[in-house]
């Protein structure tokens, strides 16, 4: 009788997998949840199903590459102007992901990767274009600042850290990361410090260019999972950079002088010819850009060779900046109007006020990037006072307010006036 009772107690204490029904003695591991149990075999089966689904979804994404027209239509919703740069980028990105979609289908011709160089004045939309592109294609995207990079073994960020950031953006999914986009900003700051090779090692300029060559062309990068410096006891993640699209961008201050002065014959004395200064704006001069100009600026020929597609961006004029303020889906005016809506107040700008804001941004030579700081300065006092005021229905900003000659116009609701009349 006692033997039967013992066996009964054992069966009561035995735990079973809620999915396959196997007992804890039949499997290696049983994981407990709040009210359920799952065995290691069911976990492995689930992982296999998820892997297969990820592969199939990846194939679908590869087959559904957006056309250049579709890409440029979405870019137009967010980025004002820069039509030439948009065309170059949309065609380049379409061809890149089309190449990835069909590389496994045909083995006769191997299509090479074409990385992109964006050249344009500060605040003209280089970084924003790259961010919007990654959002359209729905691939992992990361940004890196070239000024923080140093050659391996020196204080600063290793080049491999760029791939680590991309891996983190892909939630450590190596397959997704290997199809991502990397944007390297301020690439003009890693130019060679002098035309002549120096005895001392240039670890943050030419050294970084040399370090970027292999990952931009395609190599197996060993990435430490936690980031930072490598050490022998650490396990590495292997990431193939062959199919990662690299977009480099920079303002290249002073490059316009190199382009304008190309082919000039210098002479001195009474017979010297004085050439009139180039009165074109920076964006127009950049259209005549040649690889030799970039070499003279300080980029090494091997680095330029890894960036076969060059897209130049134009200066933003007053009309373009006014459109940037009001037209895109996430325009600055719309952002501040939403902030004021949270206080149940309508915010309105006169057209001439927006033009004055645009002119101020051009005077500061900060492009579209300077618009936010100007808007903050104009609306600071209003945003400070508004939460404490009652009955304000609308705030109107005129050109005099932007110039500092007047205060914003507050329009109060009729309810407060009615209350005053009743009390009287």
UniProtKB/Swiss-Prot annotation:
UniProt binding sites for ATP: 121-128
Q: Which positions are annotated as binding Zn(2+)?
A: 17, 20, 39, 42
Instruction: Show the PROSITE patterns listed in the entry.
Output: CLPX_ZB
Gene3D superfamilies registered for this protein in UniProt: 1.10.8.60, ClpX chaperone, C4-type zinc finger domain (6.20.220.10), P-loop containing nucleotide triphosphate hydrolases (3.40.50.300)
Q: What is one process in the GO biological process aspect for this record?
A: cell division
Gene Ontology CC terms, in alphabetical order: HslUV protease complex
Q: Which residues form the ClpX-type ZB domain?
A: 5-58
- What InterPro entries does this protein map onto? AAA+_ATPase (IPR003593), ATP-dep_Clp_protease_ClpX (IPR050052), ATPase_AAA_core (IPR003959), Clp_ATPase_C (IPR019489), Clp_protease_ATP-bd_su_ClpX (IPR004487), ClpX_bact (IPR046425), P-loop_NTPase (IPR027417), Znf_CppX_C4 (IPR010603)
Which molecular-function annotations from GO does this UniProt entry contain?
ATP binding; ATP hydrolysis activity; ATP-dependent protein folding chaperone; protein dimerization activity; unfolded protein binding; zinc ion binding
Per its UniProt entry, which superkingdom is the organism in? Bacteria
Q: Which SMART domains match?
A: AAA (SM00382), ClpB_D2-small (SM01086), zf-C4_ClpX (SM00994)
Keywords, A to Z, come to: ATP-binding, Chaperone, Metal-binding, Nucleotide-binding, Zinc
**Functional note:** ATP-dependent specificity component of the Clp protease. It directs the protease to specific substrates. Can perform chaperone functions in the absence of ClpP.
UniProt family annotation: Belongs to the ClpX chaperone family.
The subunit field of the Swiss-Prot or TrEMBL record says:
Component of the ClpX-ClpP complex. Forms a hexameric ring that, in the presence of ATP, binds to fourteen ClpP subunits assembled into a disk-like structure with a central cavity, resembling the structure of eukaryotic proteasomes.
Q: What is this protein called?
A: ATP-dependent Clp protease ATP-binding subunit ClpX
Native organism is: Bartonella henselae (strain ATCC 49882 / DSM 28221 / CCUG 30454 / Houston 1)
């Amino acid at each position: 009788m006692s033997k039967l009772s013992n066996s009964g107690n054992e069966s009561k204490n035995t735990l079973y997998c809620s999915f396959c029904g196997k007992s804890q003695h039949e499997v290696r591991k049983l994981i407990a949840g709040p009210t359920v149990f799952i065995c290691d075999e069911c976990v492995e089966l689930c992982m296999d199903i998820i892997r297969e689904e990820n592969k199939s979804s990846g194939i679908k994404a590869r087959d559904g590459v957006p056309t250049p027209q579709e890409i440029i239509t979405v870019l137009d919703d967010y980025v004002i102007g820069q039509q030439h740069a948009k065309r170059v980028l949309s065609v380049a990105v379409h061809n890149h992901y089309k190449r990835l979609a069909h590389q496994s289908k045909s083995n006769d011709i191997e299509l090479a990767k074409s990385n992109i160089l964006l050249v344009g004045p500060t605040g003209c939309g280089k970084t924003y274009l790259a961010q919007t592109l990654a959002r359209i294609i729905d691939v992992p995207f990361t940004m890196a600042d070239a000024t923080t990079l140093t050659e391996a073994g020196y204080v600063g960020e290793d080049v491999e850290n760029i791939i680590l950031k991309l891996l983190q953006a892909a939630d450590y999914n190596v397959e997704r990361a290997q199809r991502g986009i990397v944007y390297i900003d301020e690439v003009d700051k890693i130019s060679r410090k002098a035309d002549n090779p120096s005895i001392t090692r240039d670890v943050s300029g030419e050294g970084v260019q040399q370090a970027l060559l292999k990952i931009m062309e395609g190599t197996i990068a060993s990435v430490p999972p936690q980031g930072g410096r490598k050490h022998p006891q650490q396990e590495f993640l292997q990431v193939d950079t062959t199919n990662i699209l690299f977009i480099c961008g920079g303002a290249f201050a002073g490059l316009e002088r190199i382009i304008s002065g190309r082919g000039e014959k210098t002479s001195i004395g009474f017979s010297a010819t004085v050439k009139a200064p180039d009165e074109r704006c920076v964006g127009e001069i950049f259209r005549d850009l040649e690889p030799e100009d970039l070499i003279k600026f300080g980029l090494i020929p091997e680095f330029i060779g890894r960036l076969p597609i060059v897209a130049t961006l134009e200066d933003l004029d007053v009309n373009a900046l006014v459109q940037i303020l009001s037209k895109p889906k996430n325009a600055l005016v719309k952002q501040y109007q939403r902030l004021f809506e949270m206080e149940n107040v309508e915010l309105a700008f006169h057209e001439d006020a927006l033009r004055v804001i645009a002119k101020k941004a051009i005077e500061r030579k900060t492009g579209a990037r300077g618009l936010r700081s100007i808007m903050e300065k104009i609306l600071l006092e209003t945003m400070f006072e508004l939460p404490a005021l009652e009955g304000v229905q609308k705030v109107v900003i005129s050109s005099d307010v932007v110039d500092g000659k007047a205060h914003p116009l507050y329009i109060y609701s009729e309810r407060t006036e009615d209350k005053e009349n009743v009390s009287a």
